[in-house]
Amino acid sequence: AERKPLPVKTTIIGGLACGAALTIASTLQQYGLTMTTVGKGGFITTLYIILTPILGIFIGRKAPKAVWFCAVLAVAGMFLLCVNGESLSISAGDLLVLGSALVFAVHILVIDHFSPLTDGVILSCIQFAVCGVVSAIGAFIFEQPSWEQLVSGAIPVLYAGVLSCGVGYTL
């Protein structure tokens, strides 16, 4: 049977939506990690695992009962991480990383919506292009990169981009 061509408009909209979500989530996470500990940042980031099915409820998905048990454990874990002595201490960095977990959950739901409607590789390429271009614009607005820094960092940035994004988000 011949495969029906996929709509280009849907692929572009999907890539833009996925790229926007990935950019926002990554930016919140990277900025938040500068203001919290690595352990807290790692734990809080993984809350996207619980947040994804919970957010899915708002678009008509059913969450398995185990999700609610895991959500209680996750909240308890976050509480234990954030209690400092006798006071509850949630830093701005913790909140930014929590925001990133929320947006990563949205990112997964957006991918889940568009991936059956489009070519996954093209969707991923558009997503990475959006994230890369928006992040580069942000770097030039908020940083003062020199030509020497760009050249010396090109190989590590390409390596990290291809492996962590290209492989990690595409496979």
Regions found by a protein language model. Give the residues of each.
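Hydrophobic alpha-helical transmembrane segments of multi-pass integral membrane proteins
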Residues: 1, 13, 67-73, 92-96, ...
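C-terminal transmembrane-helix exit sites in multi-pass transporters
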Residues: 2-4, 48-69
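Hydrophobic transmembrane alpha-helices of multi-pass small-molecule transport proteins
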Residues: 18, 63-83, 101-104, 135
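Structural signature of hydrophobic alpha-helical transmembrane segments
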Residues: 30-48, 91-103, 152-162
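Alpha-helical transmembrane segments of compact multi-pass small-molecule transporters, enriched
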Residues: 44-57, 73, 129-134
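Residues that mark transmembrane-helix kinks and helix-interface sites
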Residues: 26-30, 50-53, 82, 104-109, ...
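Specific transmembrane alpha-helical segments of multi-pass solute transporters/efflux pumps
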Residues: 2-45, 80, 161-171
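Hydrophobic/aromatic residues within transmembrane alpha-helices
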Residues: 32, 37, 58-63, 114, ...
